[in-house]
Curated annotation (Swiss-Prot):
UniProt keyword annotations, A-Z: Phosphoprotein
Biased composition (Low complexity): 715-730, 895-928, 1001-1011, 1180-1193, 1461-1474, 1504-1516
Record region (Disordered): 145-169, 433-477, 531-602, 649-693, 715-778, 791-981, 997-1535, 1566-1610
Gene Ontology biological process terms from the UniProt entry: cell differentiation
Positions of modified residues (Phosphoserine): 24, 198, 328, 568, 639, 1089, 1167, 1233, 1386, 1388
Biased composition (Polar residues): 433-448, 578-594, 649-667, 740-760, 767-778, 851-865, 1041-1053, 1122-1153, 1405-1422
Tissue specificity remark: Widely expressed. Expressed in adult and fetal brain, fetal eyes, adult lens, kidney, liver and intestine.
Protein name per the record: NHS-like protein 1
Positions with biased composition (Basic and acidic residues): 1240-1249, 1373-1383, 1447-1460
Biased composition (Pro residues): 929-946, 970-981, 1012-1031
Pfam families membership: NHS (PF15273)
Entry-linked InterPro entries: NHS-like (IPR024845)
Superkingdom to which the source organism belongs: Eukaryota
């Protein structure tokens, strides 16, 4: 154990040692000799862990190489023995090189450490096992030990206890306060004396014990690393950091920036000494990746250290400052942070700030502690730690945090959550660039910076320190300051950091981001982070976001702080996820970078900052302050932690953007951390259950979950408001502190899963609960701790709902995960519905499956999320304990929210979305997070949400409350309000998203208004009820911006309000039961649908109440898409707008449809509500009702009304719905309403189930959708056309084509939405005009419902795989009867596969189908198309292939679908089998591939869930493209290029003169990319005109990817 403990401890402690070591290692190259010596010393010290604590401290101070060298030699020996990670790295300093005494020390330390660790384990009742964590990575010990030990060693062994005695701290201060003098002297002294001190293992043991206790009570011990000299300590740590950073190449900056750094550096091996520990640690974290590797990695590489590298490398370059440097060393983060930052601050000129920083730091320990420990013990930090300790703590936290962050992987970081410092470091890393830019360059620079610094610094210091009371509440409340503090933990140096470039980031991230996340903080954050971000923070930040990964790491550490305070001293394992997160973050970064550079930066910077700061705030401080963290972290941790509660915070602060981003980032970030995470995750699961509430609800979350769930369900509305969100955050976060950890874990695990992908997040969310699910899960979980995913995507608005959602989710375990899910899944919120179902159906299974998927997911940010989404859905559900515990239909809502967790996919998508548009994502997140929360009054709020949404989502928070209420109370009457809220979130987020897209939406106005506003209200309305209010409001608010909005607004307003009323009334009927679905008889009413539609919508909403989440998911998807769309194509702007709308209103049609209709079944058609709420509602009706009889009607209406084109889609949708119905509910089908009624029922049900499934699917597809979103925008029209033609070849062709152009904008969004929703099936219909799109959405939604049905399917992922192989023929045989289904299924089923169940089933089906298709005729073509991505494939070939593929694929999907629910494959068709079938067949042929594409995407997701498609899924997720293979091949490309490709494609499409073509192609590309082949074929046949061509090209293009993906999956 000693060795392990040492190793673990080393890793943990080595947060300091590790950091030192990492730095040493890094310097090893740079400063080989001294570094080696330092390294050895550090290693030995670290190895000693506790023993080495003092030594480490010496190390930190090791201004004198001589002592350090000796110690390092000894330490090295120990380290080598202890730290496997370091061993190899330290092997460079072979034990041979060590003196015998050192060797002996090593041995002794090992033995002692083992005993100590064991004892610690005993002492540690936080569920973290020292050995476990040590094994995993000393990170956890680092939490107590690493933070303390590392930093204690650094800070002072004296501070043996994390919150060691004040005298020691004073001594430390005395010794260390003199930065240079004490540093050098102390270094020497400490080195020798501390060596002796540290050598006595009993001391370390005691330390460990104390630390464990302290950590538990206060993860602040980690801060001890910063050991009482706020300044010196910070500097001392900073020394490491600067050194580390220096090593990273930032030493100069650090040196200059770091007063102490300079001094110490100069004293010690200017760079060597300092760098060695951090570097060492860092390297350890990276598992042998050198700084070079790290740096190489840092930019976008995945890789745990990559993030750290990112931190180092990116921050380096980004920070261009010591900040960057030490950002480089996230572990040293805070230390470096403070050190660098302080000096930097001095350099920057904020000498006062520097003093303040030190002051701040000094006070911050308290604040940090408070924050960090607020999580665990809200006031623990402050209360727990004596003032001096606090200061020290702060410093420790600061210093430690970075060290922790730098710690072996983010694990240590994560472990050292309390050290927002880590965050700082990471954050600094992430944001410093931004901040540097922002602070120095940006507006944020002076005022924001100053303000943040001041405010954050003050507030952080005061608020946290003085105000820590609010700790949970204060920062929770959105006290940027505290969150800032949270970040402040790193913020100790963070104020400096803030002052420094990074200061803005850390403070910005923590203060700004977290604060900004919250509200005022948002301000700061926005000012700083955003400005900084916007500046280049994005790019830098993104890069830096690797640092963010560090942050992520930090987050877990924070979590740990909190968790430690609570039960997760080892929570740091989350740090591992954190590490992963760094990597994930990097991934996210890439993702976000592509689309959301700024956002990415913001997310990264902020997210990362958030991750680090927030995450780690959320983690430790965020744990208690998850919301806060979330808030502060808003995004990052929202992604991870906020993914849980942070999500809520994110919802609040980062609400949409950051959280989203964070999620995205987180998701990627977490990836790296998966190994360390497992222990953390388990601990997290138990302890952090906050966000893991879903997963971990069982353990610590059980009560929290129960409480949160209750509060979420019952009170959430009130609770969820921003305050509730915060409340839940506060109460959840604080209570959830552990949960935060759990969230961190769940969130991290989930998030990690999501980190892998937001989905991973979600997965991990569930995974955390399935701690057992291995490190990966843990890893994923951590990111979730951050949300997932990414995160937080949905979190902000949803974070209130993510506090809501997360609250909802939290109870569900979704908290973190949920937030992530809601945030992360903001895109996937709808997925949650489906996810929920799957979740509910087989949450655990899914969860499990997800884990693997997560793993893959982790790699592919968004794609993973996509797959994991469904998986996560399940994962979340099970993991969330809430999903499971709350599997009720109401729970479904919760579940949906859990699903939001599940929305991880969404989060992933969110990641994508993040990339797409921070705004969109944020919006999404807000929507997602908000979905539950935002829709407060969204009806009135919607305008706000729209504007507000654009804003921070102020309305969403209120809605969040409502939504929270609704979310958790989906079953409750309250839920209805939430739906509006949800709507608003969507609306809001969408609006928010729309805000960007709004202009875009303008073009789409006609349909978009209807489409856009409609679905959100509808979708979110719980869905319909709120939707209408939201929609009208949205429309009015948002729509007004759109000219269109006037009329649709009007009609919608009229309709929507009724709908809202009815639905609100109906909310009580949230149960989406077959009965409810049946009730939902979608009436063919089209125009008069206003009332009826409202009713229907209401019914649908009611039935889809549960699907609300899915809606959300879907919406987030749409949102993501919208974002993507928006980002990708302004041209797609219409679609983007629609997409934006989709997420909100745009996706209203699609998403609304998907979310609404799919979730609502019928209401989905509301999405098309472009025409009017009435129509939208009617459309759902028609969509559902007309499916059978409306085919012709649909045709005419679509023709007559483009918006009603969706009506055209309905037939396919009907089939789709029917088929899903047949799968989902033959009973429903059986329940004969009119055909429409039946269909409506089925649709409703299907929508519901599909909603859930589709939520999964959408969750799965959201990324796809989002990717498609951008692409979908273009593709959508094509798809719509394809769909419409399929559905109504007659009408479809002409109106279709015409509409596609028109719909290109509207449908683009709609279709995109549909696409997003049901890539293929719905996608085409979607494209069919908004109507078609809506209808398709409906289909999709229904398909989603089918997918909802799939919940069980996810359980049978393996079965599905087997069945797919077995039932291939069977499916084919069934295909005939399922032909309609096929047709619809082709499009729809793909969506269904997209859904959780289909995802699972689809994976194999799609895999098989796609394989078959690919093999068939488009194998090469698909690949070519994929490669070309131009849609160059010949239409004929594509068509033929598509048709054949469709047939091949459709049956599989059919089988997949029918497999899950083969009840009446043809039953739906029955309604209008001939027509539908024929249309669908044609549609399938034309659009089948596309749907299949979606399906493929879904399957991929599903598959992703399944281990088989892990890699593919992972990449796919990451790419946000369903096609994993291609995605995998071009992850970066997928992320960046894909959108670009989409944009380019969109441009091409436009150039081609077929915006539809462009859209179709883009969508296809995205969707096709998702599905690859399916869309190509589908699209081609679909639109004879350009749409066809485009579809062909596009479809083909995606097809190859799909094929590749399938192939890979297969």
């Amino acid at each position: 154990m000693k060795k392990e403990g040492s190793s673990g401890s080393f890793r943990l402690q080595p947060n300091t040692g590790s950091l030192s070591r990492a730095v040493s290692w890094i310097n090893f190259s740079s400063l080989s000799r001294q570094t080696k010596r330092l390294f050895r010393s550090d290693g030995e010290l670290s190895v000693c862990g506790q023993q080495v604590e003092v030594d480490d401290e010496n190390w930190i101070y090791r201004a004198q190489p001589r002592k350090a060298v000796s110690n390092l030699d000894e330490e090295s020996r120990w380290t080598v023995h202890y730290t496997a990670p370091w061993h190899q790295q330290e092997n460079v300093f072979l034990p041979t090189t060590r003196p015998p005494c050192v060797e002996d020390l090593h041995r002794q330390a090992k033995l002692n450490l083992k005993s100590v660790l064991r004892e610690c384990d005993k002492l540690r009742h936080d569920g973290y096992r020292s050995s476990q964590y040590y094994s995993q990575g000393p990170t956890f010990a680092a939490n107590a030990s690493p933070f303390c030990d590392d930093y204690q060693d650094e800070d002072e062994e004296t501070d043996q206890k994390c919150s060691l005695s004040s005298s020691e701290e004073e001594r430390f201060i005395s010794i260390r306060r003199p930065k240079t003098p004490a540093s050098s002297d102390f270094s020497d002294l400490n080195t020798q004396t501390n060596w002796t001190k540290s050598l006595p293992l009993p001391t370390p043991e005691e330390k460990m014990r104390q630390q464990a206790q302290t950590v538990q009570a206060d993860v602040v011990p980690i801060n001890i690393t910063a050991s009482g000299t706020g300044q010196d300590d910070a500097d001392g740590h900073s020394v490491y950091t600067p050194d580390h950073y220096s090593t990273l190449g930032r030493f100069n900056s650090c040196r200059s920036a770091g007063q102490r750094s300079e001094t110490r550096d100069s004293s010690c091996q200017t760079e060597d000494v300092k760098v060695v520990p951090p570097s060492m640690r860092r390297i350890r974290a990276q598992k042998g990746q050198g700084i070079a590797a790290q740096m190489g990695h840092f930019s976008g590489s995945s890789g745990n250290m990559s993030v750290l590298s990112d931190s180092a490398g990116i921050v380096f370059p980004s920070r261009l400052d010591s900040d960057a440097g030490f950002h480089s060393l996230p572990r040293s983060g805070a230390r470096a942070n403070i050190q660098s930052l302080e000096p930097r601050l001095g350099a920057l000129g904020p000498a006062g700030d520097m003093n303040g920083t030190f002051l701040y730091q000094r006070g911050h320990p308290q604040a940090d502690e408070n924050l960090g420990h607020l999580g665990g013990a809200s006031g623990t930090g402050t209360l727990l730690r004596p003032k001096s300790q606090e200061l020290r703590h702060f410093e420790s936290e600061n210093i430690m945090s970075p060290a922790c962050v730098v710690s072996p992987h983010a694990t240590y970081s994560t472990s050292i959550i309390p050290n927002a410092t880590l965050s700082s470091s990471s954050e600094v890393i992430a944001i410093p660039t931004a901040q540097s830019a922002g602070q120095r360059e940006s507006k944020s620079s002076g005022s924001s910076h100053a303000r943040i610094k001041s405010r954050d610094h003050l507030i952080s210091r005061h608020a946290v320190k003085g105000d820590p009371q609010s700790p949970g509440r204060h920062w929770n409340e959105g006290h940027a300051t505290i969150l800032s503090q949270d970040l402040d933990p790193h913020s100790p140096g963070e104020p400096a950091l803030l002052s420094l470039c990074d200061s803005a980031v850390p403070l910005n991230a923590p203060a700004n981001r977290e604060n900004g996340s919250q509200a005022m903080p948002y301000n700061c954050r926005n000012n700083l982070a955003f400005p900084a971000h916007p500046q280049d923070v994005d790019g830098k930040s993104e890069s830096s976001y690797s640092g963010g990964g560090g942050h992520s790491s930090s987050e877990p550490w924070e979590y740990k702080s909190s968790g430690n305070g609570r039960a997760s001293p080892l929570k740091p394992h989350l740090a591992t996820p954190g590490y992963s997160t760094p990597t994930s973050n990097m991934s996210s970064c890439s993702l976000d970078q592509t689309s959301n550079k700024e956002d990415a930066g913001s997310l990264y910077s902020e997210d990362h900052d958030g991750y680090c700061a927030s995450v780690h705030t959320d983690s430790g401080h965020g744990s208690g302050n998850l919301c806060n963290s979330s808030d502060g972290f808003g995004n990052p941790r929202h992604s991870v932690i906020n993914v849980f509660v942070g999500r809520a915070q994110k919802n609040q602060g980062d609400r949409s953007n950051y959280q989203d981003k964070s999620l995205s980032r987180n998701i990627s970030l977490k990836k790296a951390k998966k190994p360390p995470l497992p222990p953390s995750r388990t601990d997290s699961l138990r302890r952090i259950p906050k966000k893991s509430s879903q997963c971990n609800g069982q353990v610590l979350n059980e009560s929290l979950i129960a409480t949160l769930q209750h509060s979420l369900q019952l009170s959430l509305p009130g609770k969820s408001g921003s305050s509730p969100s915060q409340s839940p955050c506060s109460d959840l976060e604080e209570p959830w502190l552990p949960r935060s950890r759990s969230q961190s874990t769940v969130s991290a695990g989930s998030s990690m899963t999501s980190a892998t992908t937001p989905n991973v997040y979600s997965l991990c969310g569930a995974t955390p609960s399935q701690s057992d699910t291995s490190s990966v899960k843990s890893e994923y979980t951590d990111p979730w701790g951050y949300y997932i995913d990414y995160t937080g995507m949905q979190e902000d608005p949803g974070n209130p709902a993510g506090g809501c959602s997360t609250s909802s989710g939290v109870p569900t375990g979704n908290g973190p995960v949920r937030h992530v899910q809601e945030g992360s899944r903001a895109t996937m919120p709808q997925v949650p519905g489906g996810s929920v179902k799957p979740k509910i159906m087989s949450p655990e299974k899914s969860h499990r499956v997800i884990s693997p998927s997560s793993g893959y997911s982790s790699q592919s940010n968004t794609p993973t999320a996509l797959t994991p989404v469904p998986v996560f859905l399940k994962s979340v559900s099970p993991a969330n304990g809430k999903g499971k515990p709350k599997p009720k239909v109401p729970e479904r809502k919760s579940s949906l929210i859990s699903s939001v967790s599940i929305s991880s996919s969404s989060t992933s998508l969110s990641s994508s979305t993040s990339t797409e548009g921070s705004g969109t994502m944020k919006k999404l997140d807000p929507a997602v997070g908000s979905p539950p929360a935002p829709p407060p009054p969204p009806v009135p709020s919607p305008p706000f949400p729209c504007p507000a949404d654009r804003s921070p989502f102020l309305p969403p928070p209120p809605p969040v409350t409502d939504c929270s209420q609704g979310s958790p109370l989906p079953h409750s009457p309250v839920f209805p309000p939430p739906p509006p809220e949800a709507l608003i979130p969507f609306c809001s987020p969408p609006d928010w998203c729309l805000s960007p897209p709004r202009p875009a939406l303008s073009p789409i106005l006609p349909d978009s208004p209807v489409s856009l506003p409609l679905p959100p209200p509808l979708l979110p309305s719980s869905e319909p009820p709120p939707a209408p209010p939201l929609d009208p409001k949205f429309m009015k608010d948002t729509r007004p911006p759109f000219t269109n909005s006037g009329q649709p607004e009007s009609s919608r307003g009229s309709l929507r309000p009724p709908s809202t009323k009815e639905e609100t009334s109906r909310p009580p009927m949230p149960l989406i039961t077959t009965e409810a679905l049946q009730m939902v008889q979608l009436r063919p009413v089209r125009k008069n649908s206003g009332a009826e539609a409202a009713q229907l919508s209401e019914r649908t909403a009611q039935e889809q109440r549960t699907p609300v989440a899915p809606q959300y998911h879907l919406k987030p998807s749409a949102f993501l898409k919208s974002r993507n769309s928006t980002n990708e194509m302004e041209s797609e702007s219409q679609p983007a707008s629609v997409t934006s709308s989709l997420p909100t209103p745009a996706k209203s049609s699609s998403q609304g449809d998907h979310g609404s209709a799919a979730e609502r079944g019928g209401p989905v058609s509301r999405s098309p509500g472009a025409p009017s709420a009435g129509e939208a509602e009617a459309r759902p009706s028609p969509s559902t009702t007309p499916l059978p009889d409306s085919s012709p009607s649909r045709k005419p209406p679509p023709i007559s009304k483009k918006p009603k084109l969706f009506l055209v889609v309905p037939p396919p949708q009907k089939d789709f719905a029917v088929e899903p119905a047949e799968n989902v509910s033959e009973a429903l089908r059986a329940v004969p309403s009119p055909t429409t009624g039946e269909e409506g029922s089925v649709h409703s049900r299907e929508a519901k189930e599909s909603s859930a499934a589709q939520a999964g699917s959408h969750a799965t597809h959201p990324g796809t959708s989002v990717l498609e979103g951008g692409a979908a925008g273009s593709m959508s029209p094509s798809r719509v056309e394809a769909n419409v033609p399929m559905v109504q070849p007659d009408v479809s062709p002409a109106p279709k084509q015409e509409e596609p152009a028109e719909n290109s904008a509207d449908t683009g969004g709609d279709g995109e939405s549909c696409l997003s929703q049901q890539d293929g099936a719905a996608g085409v219909p979607e494209t069919n005009a908004a109507g078609s799109s809506s209808e398709a959405c409906d289909f999709l939604k229904e398909d989603g419902n089918d997918e909802v049905m799939t919940p069980s399917r996810p359980r049978t992922t393996e079965d599905l795989f087997a069945a797919i192989h077995r039932s291939k023929r069977k499916v084919l045989g069934r295909r005939d009867s399922d032909d309609d289904h096929s047709r619809n299924h082709s499009p729809s089923p793909p969506v269904t596969p997209t859904g959780a169940a289909p995802s699972l089933a689809s994976p194999k089906q799609v895999g098989s189908i796609q394989r078959s298709i690919r093999k068939s005729s488009t194998s090469s073509d698909n690949f070519k198309a994929l490669l070309l991505k131009k849609g160059s494939r010949s239409d004929t070939s594509a068509r033929m292939s598509a048709a054949e593929m469709l047939k091949n694929t459709d049956p599989r999907f059919q089988r997949s679908r029918s497999e899950p629910s083969p009840d009446a494959p043809e039953s739906p068709s029955s309604c209008s089998p001939s027509k539908n079938r024929r249309a669908q067949e044609e549609w399938a042929k034309n659009e089948g591939l596309m749907p299949r594409s979606l399906s493929f995407s879904g399957p991929r997701y599903g598959r992703s869930r399944t281990p088989p498609s892990a890699a593919s899924s992972r990449y796919s997720m990451r790419n946000r493209i369903q096609s994993s293979p291609m995605t995998v091949i071009s992850e970066g490309e997928g992320e960046a290029v894909e959108p670009v490709d989409s944009i380019a494609r969109g441009a091409l499409g436009a150039a081609e003169g077929c915006s539809l073509d462009g859209l179709a192609r883009e969508e296809m590309d995205e969707g096709g990319l998702l599905c690859g082949e399916g869309p190509a074929a589908s699209l081609q046949p679909q639109a004879p005109g350009p749409v066809d061509g485009t579809a062909s090209a596009e479809g083909r293009e995606p097809s190859p990817q799909c094929g590749g993906s399938l192939s890979e999956e297969s």
